[in-house]
Amino acid sequence: YINAIYPDVGVASYKLLKSLGVDVDYPLDQTCCGQPMANAGFEDEASKLALRFDDLFKQYDYIVGPSGSCVAFVKLNHPGILAKEGHQCESAGKIYDLCAFIHDVIKPEKLKARFPHKVSIHNSCHGVRELMLSAPSELNIPYFNKLRDLLQLVEGIEIFEPSHVDECCGFGGMFAVEEQAVSVCMGRDKIRHHMETGAEYITG
């Protein structure tokens, strides 16, 4: 996904981790984790990709990805998929979303960064509800937000969060394809809520 659509995100993630002193490797022969196939009902085909993923990354101490959706699929679904193949999943316990890895593993006390702008935080559904990057509003638990914690280490930044703070933006992977009209309406609402904060940028 990152390779094909947003390669600049992959490059930026690599550079960020290197700047934080992490020994980073990037296996050039990695492929998709299998989520699109599994979501479309082809779990048998997805199992081949899950097995390849697990074998490729078993040599590493940590696995870090910038896509919360992909990370959540590996963490939560690969163990069950691979168990049907008689394979013990090794990746699920050591894969992290980029934000969670920096927040929970590296735990920086400061960042060499300055960004004097107003920024609104987008709390993605997979990040919130599957990776617990922030407190899901429906759980009625004390609020926390790992991305906000990290952004507060950036000099000059002003941080905002929209109303309906963790309401779905309408993307949802295949939902955006299968229910395009509904997805667009939800996306417009989410953008409006972000714009109402007065932010110059949106990040997630």
Model-derived features with residue positions:
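Iron-sulfur cluster-binding electron-transfer modules in prokaryotic oxidoreductases
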Residues: Y1-G204
